Amino acid sequence: MRNLEKINELLEIFGHFDVNFAKTMEEKIDTQYFVLENLKNSMNNDEMFIKLVILNSIVSYQLCTTGELWWEEFSKYWSKHDANNENLGESYVNFLENSKGNKRLLNVKIKRIERITPFLENLNLLDFKTYYSDMEKLLENLSKYLNSKKNSKTVVFAVKMFGYASRIVFNEFFPYPMNIEIPKDSRIEKYTLKFTDENPIKFWNEVSKTAKIPPLHIDSIIWPVLGRNFDFKSCENKLDENFRYLLKLTEL
């Protein structure tokens, strides 16, 4: 059942946003972007940086902590440890097995790492630059190697984080494609219930088309502010007049 009044309010709010606002949210507000910037600056290997980001993305579910803290743990660890193509999978599995924030379903997650590592080992920085301009192709290949649907949470999330990592490495912004759907995690599912009990992916696809903002960028707008430790005061000066509309998202 749909709450049409709330949906109309949501669409009115998103009428004030665009892709550039989502980019601002990503680069100035999303702590996951910050920790990737810190990690990139502490590593001397951009190719390995992107590969590690993809590996971490495909096991970022059923966490024992928040997504923000999990990515902070990832960044801190790999700023002090090395990996290369010969030991990429083994090195990452060692990190995963000893992590604090990701202890559930380890056997399943390790199998995912084993499936995707051969694909990543054969890629170089030029390949990643090509994928950055064709993220739907990356989605297709990740889906194939992981034997997962293209709209599965970790596959689309991996593309999102790959986009972050590539933006940082190549210092260039490519918007996410309209055809790549929102990662359906617990925050998004819970928030969607304010508007409808239908499939969150279907609902946010409709919002995306109306607002003319790709679903992964919509995720960047709503996901951070739904976090339980989100500090609105710290971001007010970074978002000018759009701050009040962002605040309204939490009041619906």
Swiss-Prot record:
Region of interest: Helix-hairpin-helix: 129-193
Active-site residues (renumbered): K153, D185
Transmembrane segments: none
Catalyzed reactions: 2'-deoxyribonucleotide-(2'-deoxyribose 5'-phosphate)-2'-deoxyribonucleotide-DNA = a 3'-end 2'-deoxyribonucleotide-(2,3-dehydro-2,3-deoxyribose 5'-phosphate)-DNA + a 5'-end 5'-phospho-2'-deoxyribonucleoside-DNA + H(+)
Gene Ontology biological process terms in this record: base-excision repair
GO molecular function: class I DNA-(apurinic or apyrimidinic site) endonuclease activity; oxidized base lesion DNA N-glycosylase activity
Keyword Mitochondrion carried by entry: no
Keyword field: DNA damage, DNA excision, DNA repair, Hydrolase, Lyase
EC number: 3.2.2.-, 4.2.99.18
Pfam families: AGOG
Sites where the protein binds 8-oxoguanine: Q32, S60, W71, F157, P183, D219, W223
Keyword DNA repair: yes
Family to which this protein belongs: Belongs to the archaeal N-glycosylase/DNA lyase (AGOG) family.
Task performed by this protein: DNA repair enzyme that is part of the base excision repair (BER) pathway; protects from oxidative damage by removing the major product of DNA oxidation, 8-oxoguanine (GO), from single- and double-stranded DNA substrates.
Domain remark from Swiss-Prot or TrEMBL: Contains two alpha-helical subdomains, with the 8-oxoguanine binding site located in a cleft at their interface. Contains a helix-hairpin-helix (HhH) structural motif and a Gly/Pro-rich sequence followed by a conserved Asp (HhH-GPD motif).
Name of the protein in question: N-glycosylase/DNA lyase
Source species of the chain: Methanococcus maripaludis (strain DSM 14266 / JCM 13030 / NBRC 101832 / S2 / LL)
